[in-house]
Amino acid sequence: MRAAGHGRSRVVRVDRGERAVYAVAGVVTSLAGALGRRRTHAVSKAALMPLLQVGLVRDRRLSPQGLGALLGATGAAWVGDLVLIAPEGGESGEASRRRLRKGAAAFAVQQLIYAGMLVQAGARPRPRSTAVVAGTLLGLAALDTAKESRPDPVVTAYGVLLGTTGALALGMPRSAGDLAIGRIPWGGASFVASDAMILLGEQVLTGRAAQAGHGFVLVTYALAQRWLVDGLAATARLKPVE
């Protein structure tokens, strides 16, 4: 009994340590991004998904399918994170749009995996939350089209997947006693808010408002990933820790 109890306490300590490191990396990423500290921002942002992956690999309760899916999703997000880090010397608007398309393509893979896992976990879109998500994305699409003169097919396709994941997450049934699953709706909402601000920052915001918007993008992104990965991992576990 002592050995089992000691093992459980060690798991809890490790889990808390990993969460603390991720939280620090998220704060540093957000502040560095808002303040224009590009090198610090690049290093800390590149560490976010690997930190989540460490926790996933250490979680022996995860099913092989769940582990593989979440590693694939966070791996795609890591590629997207690297692509979306702005170059230190600045870039043209056209180059920024190309970078946005590449990032959207990588994150589309993640959203597809998340949506599939949510459906498997019993999530279903609800009319009210779906209407809110759809209205938000349609408004952003209209803004983007007005600025770019025609819809961007890559960004539009990503927006559809993002909206699907967001609506599913907001429709996730509650699980009594499981806080991680209960945070899935918050993760979906945060992801939509984060990506909405990316487009607003590109099309509308300038100066200090753009910097503040960038900080908002990063903090909501870090929270969204934490909540979604934790929640989806909870839906994919086979057995409790012994």
Can you say where each PLM-predicted feature lies in the sequence?
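Short amphipathic, positively biased membrane-proximal segments
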Residues: 1-242
